[in-house]
From Swiss-Prot:
Full protein name: Calmodulin binding protein PICBP
Taxonomic superkingdom: Eukaryota
Bias type Acidic residues, positions: 297-312
Location of the region described as Calmodulin-binding in the Swiss-Prot/TrEMBL record: 493-592, 831-938, 1135-1229, 1379-1483
Annotated gene: PICBP
Keyword list, A-Z: Calmodulin-binding, Plant defense
The keyword Oxidoreductase appears for this protein: no
Biased composition (Basic and acidic residues): 76-86, 833-844, 954-971, 1316-1328
Length: 1488
């Protein structure tokens, strides 16, 4: 279509439009994500766009003064209008300048607008009837298009803006359609914009106005950040100070605002709720429509409105800004109205509120990190140790930080990590420089200069101002002297204290100076630079919200502080490291202490009873000064006076309240709790530093002046201090009860955790001599338990665990000094006579109590990392499957928590044993010190001090050759105290003894039981586990000594009859051989440590003797030893037994032997079942043998029984002589389980001996350094004390054992009596009675019962034959012994009586076990389906049988079998059965 009025210009405009379209297509290809341009009106007059009346109004209406009327009506109007059309003349002069200016600009970016910013389709100008339709949006301006536009405007000015014909509607229908479309679009857009109006984001840009309306004033009046008309950013006077946000940020802010308006931002709501509860309303808020209108009305046209999006981090430690990377943050929208400075103030208030909310939880983490780093940093030799231990923590925390970051910002966080590290290190270094600059080596000059209150106040003011002015980044911090209003009160109390003691002035001033320096140090670590709102590239970065767990955030913060402190301390000069020592002393004197008494009242001196009320008041004051959840934390953001009061009150709580004269030498136990640690250890620290004690005593006395003396009440300072403390006590008194309960619960768990570690280390310290043998046994044990497929993975896991524990040992042992200095200090303190000198000697010890606590904490932390390796390995199927049936050994393991924890303990047990076995002798001595440290921390007090003669390690009572060292010169009082401490720990009450019997009756593999928390119950369980093993060993020693091998072979044959599978029998034989080798190794190990008798009689100086000398001496003294063992209850042989092989040595050797054999019980007798090569064509008859828990235990005992017999039978004659000595050890040390084998009269004595052996074994296990001779002498007195209690306990045990076996014994006695009666009755009457008894049970088939009766009779016959033969052989042996030893009739009679009782007990136990196997005999036979099923319906008879009926059926089965066996016995055997009945009558209550 041609234009009759402007033909040339129309062609040019059309060409320019086509060129714009092509350029637009190219730009869309270049951009990955095209941004929609806002639709602005163009100047092309195409279509019926304008009317004649509207065009003059457009160019004449855009003035700066008509802004008020238009802006109130529309939200997206431009604010530049002109009053009259006179200014249009100036357009011609301004346009060339603007064109040149645009040509110079290299890049003109496009405006990306949201749908929210799309213009309204219609707008009213001066009236409602006049409509103006917006044209398409302006495309990218070029030089050609701008020239064409200028020409158009000039032509319009010349022709008076005549209306072209194409602007007029052709028909009424066209005009109606245009009006309808305009109304619909306007209504839709008004609905969309109505709820999304915002004063700062919905403003129109300069391109909203007509492009030709720009004038001279337009550049000055334009208030928009970016103007498409001018093609550049506007920089006004107000914007010079703060950078202008870019277009990209402006667009992103509008998009974010849209999303938040549609759905209310949950994060802002949550932040507002949490902050409003604690710290008042939130600074940032969301602007509503009403508020935006009010802001629009108040705008004057200046470029002062700015919208900033500020991210306020709320980190836990409130420290550096860069530390907030990887943490959760909250975004707060702040509207800055008229002034940039006002916006800065608003942002500072919001940030300060969020920061102050988190400063309360800073203290514990910061105190702990600084204390640990300073303690490790000032030691020159610890650099390597810190390097090794810190690498693991850095790696772990780096992983935590990386996992915490979102997937979108990982690259950005990775770039900033190094920057964060460097800035944190610089901050900490500045803090160290400031604090170390004020620490002098000689505190005397500083102390003398400050002697008055005025000097104190002036000095503190200068120091505080200097500390604040030294750092420019922390200018917003207030001076310390203004905040510490109560500092003069403390100074006055110190000055008043000088009246009572003038010699303490310098120490008090140094103490107060330490408080101030540490306070400044913490503040300098906690300072925060002011955030710059917009700075170059950082202003364009959009901060995003991240979500992170609290635990990960805490680890990241601790790692950041740890890393910075380690880097700073490593780079310090030697002179500065000396100053760090002073800082460490300050931490030791000011570290937060918990003085609550939880079971440590025995350590407090008797003088404290007078001041219990004062202690209780101060305790409440200390706990009320803090929050209920975190009382022990010292927050750096709090006042200095509050910190001083807390530290002084905490130290005062732990000091014995004595008189003023005794305050100088106070030795107080304090408790240091670490709330942040994962292990939560309870550690008792005896404060032995004299300077620390004096300082704390002075501070405590300064706090309690108003409570002690009447003269102190006159001072106003003390009154104000007491009032201040009383107010705090009343306000925070409600939180005390809940906190005490939480602390008590934590204390129990902490002590339990530490006791487990102490027990593990002590266990391996005692058993480290035979570590190589244990290593082989554990390897065999893992092979049997896990199988051959898993051994490679288990070896790798074990190697990793051993390596980590070795690193832990190297770390902890490198910091433990040699014991020579400790021994010298102990000897010096023992020679001193006065108590003050003793305390001073203790404080001079290099390895003080606080260092022990720190080392133990590190050691436990390093050991906890060992639990990470998982010993399990994926089971992969073989690559080539065999044609044979696969032998799959399935090992079912429960998933309960107890099983997992026990598996971890087993892994730690193995790793500790391996690590201790590889230590050098010097390091083993240091491990002894570590064990002593565990004892001190757990028990709360040191063991009695040893003299030079008795200062050997804990394990010197047994050496590699098994020779205890005789120690002389020990004081009687100290020895008695030591014995009391040993037996006071392991006294077992009556309830624990009952629990011991229950444990004895439980199955051996009780892995699913819950973990035992009580330490005494754990001891009882260990005794119960060992009791069955002691019984088996004793049984085989007795049988070997008496030569009863034939009976054992028959009993084993009876047990072997249960295994009816031939393939299983072959593999059981293979298992036996392995078990025999293990038992033989255990025997060789224990026999090699049994010394010769003659060497014990002469002296114990020689450590190594040859085997030949042992054989000769044993052969010479064998008869003498037998006489000694036979007459153990006579006082004639007690002296000889004292000189020789004492009871303590026997207990240790037997305990080791039991522990060696204890690993064999885990061997499972089950074997993989192999399918046959050729399956039988007939129907397979499968016999399922249900094995109960008792049966499983019996099978294990049978396996050990067989292995012990085979091992003893293959011993050499010389070793069999040693076996006789071992059997005599069993005679002298009677066991708990053998009490039932004695007569009722001798039950109490045997119980006493068993109790004596158990207590002595535990004492030797945990207190190896105790003198063997002293313990043996004290055991006699203990035996006399336990006789009365043992009688009652023995009766209860006898009743329980008799109840267990009463049913079987009653059946046997009944059968013996029936046998005697049946001999007199005729055979006919007996047959009738048997038939009647058989008819009673109608549910059992006759044919099947005959088969089972014969099998049961054969089993019982074999058992009785074996027992009868044993009894006859025993009688023959006893007769021979009585004939040979006719001269010693008394000794032989006692021996015969004792052995007869013991043999009866053994034989009866075996017989009862055999009968229990008969009871397990299942009379039911598997029911097979017929090969040809019948057509009729199957008739199934269900027989419901109760538990009592089932029990009666079992008893009837045994009764019937006994009747059959007894009736068929020969007269000779019936006589032997009578002896068996007599044995039952002597041991059973039913016989009486």
């Amino acid at each position: 279509m041609s234009n009759p009025m402007f033909p040339e210009k129309w062609e040019e405009s059309s060409t320019s439009k086509s060129s714009r379209r092509v350029h637009k297509r190219r730009e869309r290809k270049m951009w990955k994500k095209p941004i929609k341009l806002s639709r602005f009106p163009s100047f092309g007059f195409s279509g019926s766009d304008f009317t004649l009346d509207q065009i003059p109004a457009i160019f004449s209406g855009y003035t700066a003064e008509s802004e008020d009327s238009s802006s109130s009506e529309m939200s997206d109007d431009s604010r530049t209008y002109s009053k009259s059309s006179d200014e249009n003349e100036e357009l011609d002069q301004e346009r060339p300048r603007s064109v040149k200016r645009r040509a110079k600009s290299k890049s003109i970016s496009r405006i990306s607008s949201m749908k929210v910013l799309r213009r309204q389709s219609t707008r009213t100008l001066y009236g409602a009837g006049q409509r103006l339709k917006k044209m398409r949006s302006m495309k990218r301006l070029t030089s050609n298009s701008r020239q064409i536009l200028r020409k158009k405007n000039l032509d319009r000015g010349d022709f008076g803006l005549l209306q072209p014909h194409y602007l007029r509607p052709t028909s009424s229908s066209a005009s109606k359609n245009v009006e309808n479309n305009q109304k619909n679009l306007g209504a839709a857009r008004l609905k969309r914009i109505a709820s999304l109006r915002y004063n700062g984001l919905l403003k129109a840009t300069c391109s909203s106005a007509m492009k030709g309306s720009s004038s001279k004033r337009s550049n000055d009046v334009c208030t928009y950040r970016y103007c498409s008309l001018h093609g550049r950013r506007h920089s006004h006077a107000a914007d010079n100070n703060a950078g202008v946000p870019s277009l990209k940020r402006f667009v992103s802010m509008r998009r974010k605002f849209m999303n938040r308006q549609k759905s209310v931002n949950r994060r802002l709501v949550l932040l507002k709720r949490t902050l409003s509860r604690k710290r008042g309303p939130l600074g940032g808020r969301v602007v509503t429509d009403q508020e935006s209108k009010e802001v629009d009305d108040n705008v004057d046209g200046d470029s002062d409105e700015e919208v900033f999006e500020e991210e306020v981090s709320s980190s836990v430690d409130g420290g550096n800004d860069n530390e907030s990377i990887g943490r959760s943050s909250e975004t707060v929208m702040v509207d800055v109205d008229d002034n940039v400075d006002r916006g800065m103030d608003a942002m500072e208030t919001v940030a300060s509120k969020v920061q102050e909310s988190k400063t309360e939880t800073v203290g514990a983490t910061l105190w702990r990190a600084i204390c640990e780093q300073t303690v490790t940093g000032h030691d020159h030799d610890d650099g390597k140790v810190d390097g090794t231990t810190s690498d693991g923590t850095v790696g772990d925390n780096e992983e935590v930080c990386r996992e915490g970051s979102s997937g979108e910002l990982r690259e950005e966080d990775g770039k900033k990590t190094e920057y964060v590290w460097n800035e944190t290190v610089t901050l900490v270094k500045q803090a160290f420089d400031e604090i170390l600059a004020e620490i002098t080596d000689d505190d005397s000059s500083d102390d003398i200069s400050m002697t008055k209150d005025e000097a104190l106040e002036v000095g503190l003011g200068e120091e505080d101002v200097g500390a604040d002015s030294s750092d420019s980044s922390c200018s917003d911090m207030q001076p310390v002297i203004e905040r510490d209003t109560h500092l003069s009160v403390i100074a006055s109390t110190f000055h008043m204290r000088d009246e009572f003691g003038h010699q303490r002035g310098p120490k008090k001033w140094s103490y107060l100076k330490r408080v101030i320096l540490l306070k400044r140090f913490l503040k300098s670590l906690d300072r925060k630079e002011r955030r710059k709102l917009s700075d170059g590239k950082e202003s364009e970065t959009i901060m995003r919200l991240r979500r992170e767990l609290v635990g990960e955030r805490k680890n990241a913060e601790e790692w950041m502080l740890d890393h910075a402190l380690r880097q700073v301390i490593s780079t310090l000069a030697p002179s500065q490291k000396k100053k760090v020592k002073h800082l460490v002393k300050a931490f030791e004197s000011l570290i937060p202490m918990d003085g609550g008494s939880r079971g440590h009242d025995d350590l407090v001196s008797p003088a404290r009873e007078e001041n219990e009320t004062v202690n209780s008041q101060t305790q409440t004051i200390l706990r009320d000064n803090k929050d209920a959840t975190d009382i022990l934390e010292v927050s750096p953001a709090k006042d200095l006076e509050e910190t001083n009061l807390t530290c002084e009150a905490s130290s005062f709580l732990s000091i014995d309240m004595k008189s003023d004269e005794e305050n100088e030498t106070v030795n107080s136990p304090t408790i240091w709790r670490d709330n942040e640690d994962t292990t939560d250890l309870l550690e008792v620290v005896p404060a032995k530093d004299l300077e620390e004690t004096n300082l704390t005593s002075e501070s405590s006395s300064s706090l309690c002046i108003g409570m002690k003396s009447d003269e102190a009440l006159e001072s106003t300072a003390d009154a104000s201090l007491c009032n201040h403390l009383a107010v705090e006590e009343e306000v925070d008194g409600l939180a005390l009860g809940s906190f005490i309960e939480e602390e008590e619960k934590k204390g129990e768990s902490e002590k339990q955790n530490l006791s487990t570690w102490r027990n593990l280390i002590q266990k391996h310290m005692v058993m480290r001599d035979n570590s190589e043998g244990n290593r082989n046994e554990t390897e065999q044990e893992h092979k049997w338990s896990y199988g051959t497929d898993q051994m490679t993975g288990i070896d790798d896991a074990n190697a990793a665990a051993v390596k980590s524990i070795q690193l832990a040992f190297e770390t902890i042992l490198s910091e433990i000094p040699d014991s020579s200095s400790d021994e010298e200090s102990v000897s010096e303190s023992s020679n001193s006579l006065k108590e003050e000198k003793e305390h001073q000697g203790e404080t001079k010890r290099s390895w003080n109590s606080l260092r022990k606590v720190i080392l133990l904490k590190r050691f436990v932390k390093s050991l906890e990392k060992v639990q990470v390796p998982n010993p399990r390995k994926m089971r992969n199927l073989p690559v080539e499957s065999a044609f044979e049936a696969e032998n799959v050994f399935l090992r079912h393991r429960s998933i309960m928590e107890g099983t997992r924890t026990e598996g971890e303990e087993m892994m730690l047990d193995y790793a500790l044993r391996q690590a201790i076995s590889r230590l050098a002798p010097i390091q083993r001595k240091k491990v002894d010190l570590l064990v002593q440290a565990f004892d001190i921390v757990l028990d709360g007090h040191d063991t009695p001090k040893q003299t030079k003669n008795s200062d050997t390690p804990r394990n010197n009572d047994e050496t590699k050759e098994g020779k205890p060292r005789v120690e002389e010169g020990c004081e009687v009082n100290k020895d008695e105290q030591k014995i009391k401490n040993v037996f006071a720990r392991f006294q077992v009450h009556q309830k624990d003894l009952k629990g011991e019997e229950e444990v004895h009756n439980t199955p051996k593999e009780s892995r699913n039981l819950p973990p035992i928390r009580n330490f005494k119950q754990r001891i009882v369980v260990e005794k119960g586990k060992d009791s069955r093993m002691w019984k088996l060993i004793y049984k085989h020693m007795v049988t070997e000594k008496e030569g009863i091998d034939s009976a054992n072979a028959e009993s084993v044959a009876s047990v072997e009859s249960e295994y009816d599978d031939e393939a299983g029998g072959l593999q059981i034989d293979a298992r036996r051989s392995g078990t025999v080798t293990l038992v033989r190794e255990a025997l060789e190990k224990i026999l090699s440590e049994i010394p010769d008798n003659s060497s014990d009689d002469q002296s114990m100086d020689s450590d190594i003797t040859t085997e030949q000398e042992l054989f000769e001496r044993n052969s010479q003294v064998s008869e003498e030893k037998s006489e000694v063992s036979s007459a153990t209850f006579k006082p004639k042989f007690t002296e000889k037994r004292v000189k020789g092989w004492n009871n303590v040595k026997k207990v240790i050797l037997l305990k080791r032997f039991v522990s060696d054999l204890g690993s064999l019980t885990r061997l499972s007798p089950k074997t993989p079942r192999v399918l046959p090569w050729e399956p039988d064509p007939e129907t397979e008859k499968i016999r399922l043998r249900h094995q109960e828990i008792g049966g499983k235990r019996n099978s294990e005992e049978w396996m050990l029984d067989y292995a012990l017999r085979q091992a003893i039978s293959t011993l050499a004659p010389s070793q069999k002589r040693k076996v006789s000595l071992l059997a005599q050890a069993f005679d002298t040390i009677s066991l708990q389980d053998m009490g039932s084998g004695s007569t009722p009269g001798s039950a109490a004595s045997s119980r006493n001996i068993s109790r004596q052996s158990s207590i002595s074994s535990m004492a030797a296990h945990y207190e190896n350094e105790a003198n063997a001779e002293i313990i043996r002498g004290k055991l006699r007195n203990l035996q006399e004390d336990l006789k009365e209690s043992a009688k009652l306990d023995g009766v209860s045990k006898d009743l329980e054992e008799k109840q267990q076996c009463s049913s079987l014994w009653r059946i046997l006695c009944k059968q013996m009596e029936d046998n005697e009666k049946n001999q007199t009755l005729p055979e006919e009457t007996r047959k009738e009675e048997e038939e009647e008894e058989l008819k009673e049970d109608t549910s059992v088939d006759g044919e099947k019962m005959e088969l089972y009766q014969t099998e049961a009779v054969e089993l019982l016959g074999e058992v009785i034959d074996g027992i009868s033969l044993e009894e006859s052989q025993d009688q023959n042996l006893n007769n021979e012994e009585t004939r040979q030893k006719s001269e010693t009739l008394q000794v032989s009679k006692v021996r015969i009586d004792r052995w007869s009782n013991l043999k009866r007990a053994i034989l009866l136990r075996r017989f009862v076990k055999a009968l229990e196997n008969v009871r397990k005999f299942n009379p039911r036979e598997p029911r097979f389906l017929p090969p040809n099923p019948e057509v009729e319906a199957e008739k199934v008879n269900l027989r419901h049988q109760e538990t009592q009926n089932k029990k009666n059926g079992d008893e009837w089965m045994v009764d019937n079998a006994l009747q059959g066996v007894v009736s068929k016995l020969t007269p000779a055997r019936k006589l032997k059965v009578q002896l068996l009945v007599q044995a039952f009558e002597s041991l059973s209550a039913t016989g009486n």
